[in-house]
């Protein structure tokens, strides 16, 4: 009822305010904020009282929620675009570990002038308060009522309360100005880290994985920015307060005060040691946190292959190992923090006891004014005494974070960001005319270059390599010497000399692992060049990698890639890349969201979108790294004729890396690399004359090229792609952005859930259920109240001591009992903190374990609809909140409310009439917290949610660094990141503004409480001792009012992190659980593993009317699919790219469940087989090769099931023995994520094949297993497969028809349907069969036909 009245009242107020603000100017910001910050145009009084925040408070209260468009824009001075400029001129070239922190002090401290002034007033009022209290207690102590002037008493009360109010206002303004400064540091550092991420070299990326960078941006930047809130000023301020208050103490109690000060000084080194220990364990915990986050990121990014290999448990155990070490160091950090806290509490009392004992033993009388003034001074001293070690701890804890950020900012960058590299590429070599290669102007010329992936020992390579020829010769000798001395220098390419003619098509080919990708990376400055020169490389380059980089955005946005939309060019690009049919089949046409890394597209579709992006960019130079291997022959021919050789690229410089040698004769220039990295170059005719027999390589008599009489492309017979483009109008592929139905269909990513309203009791109950029983929790909470009650007894005992209430007792009696009371308090304090530590530690441990298992066992649909950055946010920031912050917050909330409760009871016990003002204040307190909490809670929730886009973009850009840099799109992504950071900082900014709003009002309420208590005690309480005690108690409670409500909201905020984690723990699991918490817990419809011991033993596969949908309301990807595979049969699956071939593989592994129909293996419905059993029973060589962080051995045999001999035998079968033997540590060589530091793309495919050969599977599925391998190696691997898999049922998905030509049967898939299924010979005998056309479209037609006839 009371709440309804409040809402009705404030609703009227809100309408009045809306009328006043109708003409309020709107912001031009492009983000979701819609109004300028009210602080900019507010009066001085409004700024001091924070009245400018009131409207936002009212909105949150009346709506019980806040949306993004309710939040004001960030002030221009605090936006990242402004603050990041302060770090632009930082010089990190020296070896000092403190360069960054010095620069921050230099640039940001001048902005803190208002905070410094506010802090000065805090010091002044802190010093004056005890003096005013001394005068007031002196007045109270006057025994003769006739000597007391009521007016004087009132004036003394007002003077005391004025000091209290002045200190409170100064404190709030100090926090506000200080936090704004730290806030600026946070934004500037986050911006700098992202800018650096976009420049990282390949060598730096080995050390700095995306997970580690996320931790640096979230945890380390937060540590640094929090230090610059107030701690950097408080270190000096608190020291000054301690000295001034100790001086005042000496004034009150004489030299006895120095004894207490001495005790305090003696304890400080112990505090410092404990702080250092705690900081040391914090640094270690951050290292393990980095490792854990990196592994988690790897798991989430590669979740599909992990599931297909049934390796979830293996990687969960790997992550758990890092988590255990992280938790161990977190516990030790908290333990030493507890000891430090105990020392502070003990020290504060020992200082008081030693001072009073010395004062009494020296013959002085303990009077009220001395006792309670000293108590107040000690109370005032307690704050800097507690906070100074904490400030020092923050400063010490800052060091590892500063080092981590600084080391990251100092890490090596891609060479293209070096001005020497830029200058070199912009000039043509002056000695070109003396070179026997005779390059023309604007040709790309590489002279005497040595390229390597790893960072050289002397990473200032430009100073080494630029100069005259004599210096270069000396450099060559130096390099060769180093190579002999250090086996870690593994040069992939040495002494490279080549020309890429301008405006021509240059093809690069060679055996797998010969260095083709390394060569093009060297051209664009992505690997290290130790000597020689590269010139003529255009500034404007389009690039496609073997693993296409796709944004989590619409298909159109991926093609445009930041360029303006030109509809005519866009249409031509879609037709040239054969995307028309694919786009028309998508639910939202070209506006369809394609998911992170193109997760809902086939490999061929992803490659064609990457090609379309390159084509649309209209660059001067195009570099394609094996784009044609991912598509079928028909599409490959179309892409070559209409894209690579088409009108949009005509007369442009094109470099094509390919194993598709049927296109070699059409090249203007050819570069052939052998296995030693040596190259031969020339035209097709010149290379034939040099002995390069392409005819023997291609195994065909049909390959010819007559340069003078090249066949005109317009005379070629139209293939099916061209017919499709004529039938399907390209306009049908372009969607209307204003069509709401289409936009809804186009969406893939789900909106991140935001909790609404108050945190319910059940949420707290659920949280504590992870950490303890109800009994343990009850005991812990009770001990907080019991402890504070005992502590309050010690204050009453001081009053008894002062008044000598017990006759005939000496000072030692009072001191003894005082120490006994305090000793009891210390014991209870230790027990309650250790119990709470144990509870929060167990919560963190159990919660992360549950989260990891839940996410790992979630369906693939979950990963399709949630970007990896959003998921990782649960494992980084949210987990950090639970691990680190919850213990501190719960401790402070418990202490605050137990202190408030016991303190208020004490005041009412002494002054019963105080019940009336306290009831009035309680009502006001209730109203304030009701107004404040909704806005504070919602702003903090938005702050948590708006972190996810930052992490998602960081993860995405990290994965696509090469593409982003090559297309020179850094500025676009920096702008997007700056907008994301500003949105997040905006929530953070107004969250603190709301805190200050309520704190200011609560401080005023506290001032009112102090005023009434001191006034009533002064005028109406006859017992002078109790009167003095009530005043000092009211003074001590003043800060608890605002502190308590702020910490309550902080608790709700951290509970929001818990709720976000809990929501992921409760997500549906895929199919039948892989691992149950109870091993006997099996679905009633699931077949137990015990009944499938030897399954499958025949390998018979049957699809019965199978229908597969990736989205509930989308068109089926497989339609009414039915076929049967007999035991040991070899089935080849072919079809146009995007036809549904890989979906067949996914359905066999139940990566996506059948919406209709059945899949049977040896007569058993696989939907009733537990996923762990199903997936571990089928071998897979995936379309995208999968290498995880670890050794070569662990990648081949993660469970240590095989001997060295067996592993080497399988390695030799896949032709990787020489490559692995050339590595320093052989099988123990460490590979980074994706294996980029050790293997080429083709070699990674062979490594995946090695895993499958090693295990004895009855059913094996190969999805484009040799697509990126040269023809010769592919033939050897084909023979290996035939020998090792002869007794296995094999399904082979391939675009190279020679790969599947020996299969027993061929399944031809088109648009998700099985259109042909028969033996190769039978299908060849049908003139118009799809398979017949595919065979004839291949270069190796005669050889394939002969193979079929022989069979």
UniProtKB/Swiss-Prot annotation:
One Pfam family from the record: ABC_tran
Domain ABC transporter stretches: 474-700, 1101-1336
InterPro entries per UniProt: AAA+_ATPase, ABC1_TM_dom, ABC1_TM_sf, ABC_transporter-like_ATP-bd, ABC_transporter-like_CS, ABC_transporter_C-like, ABCC_6TM_D1, ABCC_6TM_D2
Coiled coil residues, start to end: 701-734
Gene Ontology terms for molecular function: ABC-type transporter activity; ATP binding; ATP hydrolysis activity; ATPase-coupled transmembrane transporter activity
Binding site for ATP: 510-517, 1135-1142
Domain of life of the source: Eukaryota
Subcellular location: Membrane
Primary location group: membrane
GO cellular component term, pick one: membrane
Protein name, per record: ABC transporter C family member 6
Organism: Dictyostelium discoideum (Social amoeba)
Gene that encodes the chain: abcC6
């Amino acid at each position: 009822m009371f709440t309804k009245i409040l809402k009705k009242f404030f609703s009227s107020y809100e309408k009045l305010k809306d009328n006043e603000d109708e003409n309020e100017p709107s912001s031009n910001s492009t983000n979701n904020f819609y109004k300028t910050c009210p602080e900019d145009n507010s009066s001085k009084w409004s700024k001091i009282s924070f009245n400018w925040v009131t409207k936002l408070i009212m909105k949150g209260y009346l709506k019980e929620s806040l949306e993004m468009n309710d939040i004001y824009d960030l002030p221009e001075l605090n936006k990242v675009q402004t603050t990041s400029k302060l770090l632009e001129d930082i010089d990190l070239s020296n070896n000092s570990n403190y360069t960054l922190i010095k620069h921050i002090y230099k640039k940001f401290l001048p902005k803190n002038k208002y905070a410094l002034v506010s802090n000065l007033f805090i010091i002044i009022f802190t010093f004056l308060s005890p003096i005013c209290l001394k005068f007031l207690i002196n007045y109270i102590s006057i025994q003769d009522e006739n000597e007391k002037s009521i007016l004087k008493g009132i004036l003394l009360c007002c003077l005391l309360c004025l000091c209290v109010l002045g200190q409170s206002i100064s404190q709030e303004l100090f926090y506000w100005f200080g936090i704004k400064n730290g806030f600026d540091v946070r934004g500037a550092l986050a911006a700098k880290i992202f800018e650096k991420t976009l420049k990282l070299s390949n060598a730096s990326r080995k050390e700095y994985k995306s997970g580690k960078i996320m931790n640096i941006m979230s945890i380390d930047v937060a540590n640094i920015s929090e230090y610059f809130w107030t701690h950097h000023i408080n270190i000096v301020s608190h020291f000054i307060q301690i000295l001034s208050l100790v001086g005042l103490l000496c004034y009150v109690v004489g030299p006895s005060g120095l004894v207490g000060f001495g005790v305090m000084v003696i304890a400080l080194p112990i505090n410092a040691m404990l702080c250092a220990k705690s900081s040391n364990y914090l640094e270690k915990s951050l290292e393990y946190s980095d490792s854990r986050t990196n592994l988690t990121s790897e798991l989430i990014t590669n979740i599909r292959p992990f599931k297909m290999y049934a390796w979830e448990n293996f990687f969960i155990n790997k992550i758990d190992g890092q988590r255990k070490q992280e938790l161990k160091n977190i516990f030790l950090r908290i333990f030493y923090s507890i000891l430090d806290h105990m020392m502070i509490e003990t020290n504060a009392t020992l200082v008081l006891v030693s001072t009073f004992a010395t004062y009494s033993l020296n013959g002085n009388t303990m009077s009220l004014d001395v006792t309670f003034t000293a108590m107040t001074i000690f109370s005032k001293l307690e704050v800097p005494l507690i906070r100074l070690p904490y400030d020092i701890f923050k400063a010490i804890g800052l060091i590892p974070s500063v080092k981590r950020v600084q080391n990251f900012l100092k890490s090596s960058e891609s060479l293209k960001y070096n001005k020497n590299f830029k200058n070199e590429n912009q000039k043509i070599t002056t000695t070109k005319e003396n070179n026997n290669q005779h390059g023309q102007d604007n040709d790309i010329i590489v002279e005497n270059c040595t390229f390597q992936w790893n960072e050289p020992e002397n990473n200032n390579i430009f100073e080494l390599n630029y100069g005259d020829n004599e210096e270069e010769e000396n450099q060559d000798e130096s390099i060769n010497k180093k190579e002999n001395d250090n086996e870690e220098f593994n040069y992939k390419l040495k002494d490279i000399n080549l020309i890429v003619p301008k405006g021509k098509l240059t093809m690069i080919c060679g055996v797998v692992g010969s260095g083709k990708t390394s060569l093009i990376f060297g051209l664009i400055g992505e690997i290290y060049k130790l000597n020689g020169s590269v010139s003529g490389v255009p500034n404007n380059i389009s690039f496609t990698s073997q693993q296409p980089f796709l944004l989590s955005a619409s298909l159109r946005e991926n093609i445009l890639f930041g360029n303006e939309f030109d509809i005519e060019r866009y249409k031509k690009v879609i037709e040239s890349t054969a995307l028309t049919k694919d786009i028309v089949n998508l639910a939202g046409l070209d506006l369809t969201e394609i998911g992170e890394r193109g997760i809902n597209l086939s490999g061929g579709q992803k490659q064609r979108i990457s090609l379309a992006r390159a084509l649309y960019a209209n660059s001067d130079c195009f570099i394609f790294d094996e784009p044609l291997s991912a598509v079928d022959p028909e599409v490959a021919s179309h892409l070559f004729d209409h894209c690579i050789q088409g009108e949009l690229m005509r007369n442009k410089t094109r470099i094509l890396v390919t194993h598709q040698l049927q296109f070699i004769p059409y090249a203007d220039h050819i570069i052939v690399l052998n296995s030693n990295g040596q190259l031969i170059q020339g035209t097709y005719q010149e290379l034939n004359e040099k002995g390069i027999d392409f005819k023997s390589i291609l195994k065909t008599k049909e390959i010819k090229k007559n340069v003078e009489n090249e066949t005109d492309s317009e005379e070629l017979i139209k293939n099916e792609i061209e017919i499709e483009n004529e039938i399907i109008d390209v306009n049908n592929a372009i969607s209307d952005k204003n069509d709401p139905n289409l936009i809804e269909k186009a969406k893939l990513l789900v909106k991140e859930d935001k909790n609404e309203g108050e945190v319910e009791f059940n949420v707290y109950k659920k949280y504590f259920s992870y950490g303890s029983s109800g009994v343990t929790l009850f005991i812990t909470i009770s001990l907080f109240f019991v402890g504070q009650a005992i502590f309050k007894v010690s204050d009453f005992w001081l009053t008894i001591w002062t008044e000598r209430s017990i006759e005939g007792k000496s000072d030692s009696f009072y001191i003894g009992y005082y120490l006994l009371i305090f000793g009891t308090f210390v014991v209870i304090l230790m027990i309650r903190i250790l119990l709470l530590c144990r509870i929060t530690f167990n919560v963190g441990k159990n919660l992360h374990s549950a989260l990891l298992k839940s996410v790992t066992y979630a369906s693939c649909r979950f990963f399709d609809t949630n970007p990896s950055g959003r998921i990782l946010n649960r494992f980084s920031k949210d987990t950090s909140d639970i691990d680190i912050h919850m213990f501190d917050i719960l401790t402070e909330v418990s202490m605050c409310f137990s202190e408030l409760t016991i303190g208020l009871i004490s005041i009412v016990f002494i002054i019963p009439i105080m019940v009336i003002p306290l009831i009035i204040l309680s009502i006001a307190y209730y109203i304030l917290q009701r107004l404040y909490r909704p806005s504070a809670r919602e702003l903090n929730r938005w702050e948590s949610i708006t972190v996810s886009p930052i992490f998602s973009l960081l993860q995405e850009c990290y994965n696509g660094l090469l593409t982003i840099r090559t297309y020179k799109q850094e500025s676009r992504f920096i702008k997007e990141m700056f907008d994301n950071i500003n949105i997040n900082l905006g929530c953070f900014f107004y969250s603190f503004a709301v805190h200050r709003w309520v704190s200011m009002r609560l401080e005023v309420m506290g001032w009112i409480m102090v005023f009434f208590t001191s006034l009533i005690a002064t005028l109406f309480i006859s017992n002078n001792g109790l009167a003095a005690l009530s005043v000092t108690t009211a003074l001590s409670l003043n800060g608890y009012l605002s502190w308590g409500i702020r910490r309550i909201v902080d608790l709700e905020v951290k509970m929001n992190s818990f709720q976000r984690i809990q929501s992921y723990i409760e997500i549906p699991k895929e199919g039948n659980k892989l691992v149950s918490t109870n091993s006997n817990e099996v679905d009633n419809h699931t077949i137990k593993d015990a009944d499938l011991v030897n399954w499958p033993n025949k390998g018979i596969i049957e699809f019965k009317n199978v229908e597969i949908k990736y989205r509930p309301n989308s068109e089926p990807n497989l339609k009414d699919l039915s076929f049967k595979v007999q035991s040991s049969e070899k089935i080849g699956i072919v079809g146009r790219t995007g036809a549904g071939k890989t979906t067949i593989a996914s359905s066999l592994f139940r990566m996506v469940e059948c919406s209709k129909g059945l899949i049977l293996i040896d007569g058993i419905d696989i939907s009733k087989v537990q996923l762990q059993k199903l997936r571990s029973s089928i071998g897979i060589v995936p379309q995208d090769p999968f290498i995880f962080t670890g050794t070569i051995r662990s990648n081949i045999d993660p469970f240590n099931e095989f001997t060295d001999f067996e592993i080497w035998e399988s390695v030799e079968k896949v032709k990787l023995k020489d490559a692995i033997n050339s590595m320093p540590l052989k099988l123990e060589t460490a590979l980074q994520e994706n294996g980029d530091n050790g293997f080429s793309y083709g070699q990674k495919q062979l490594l995946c094949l090695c895993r499958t050969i090693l295990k004895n599977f009855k059913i094996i599925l190969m999805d484009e297993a040799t697509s990126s391998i040269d023809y010769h190696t592919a033939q050897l691997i084909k023979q290996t497969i035939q020998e090792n898999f002869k007794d296995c049922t094999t399904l082979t998905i391939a675009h190279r028809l020679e790969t599947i030509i020996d299969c027993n049967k061929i399944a031809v898939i088109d648009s998700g349907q099985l259109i042909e299924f028969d033996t190769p010979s039978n299908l060849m005998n049908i003139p118009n069969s799809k398979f017949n056309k595919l065979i004839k479209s291949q270069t190796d037609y005669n050889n394939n036909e002969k193979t079929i006839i022989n069979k």
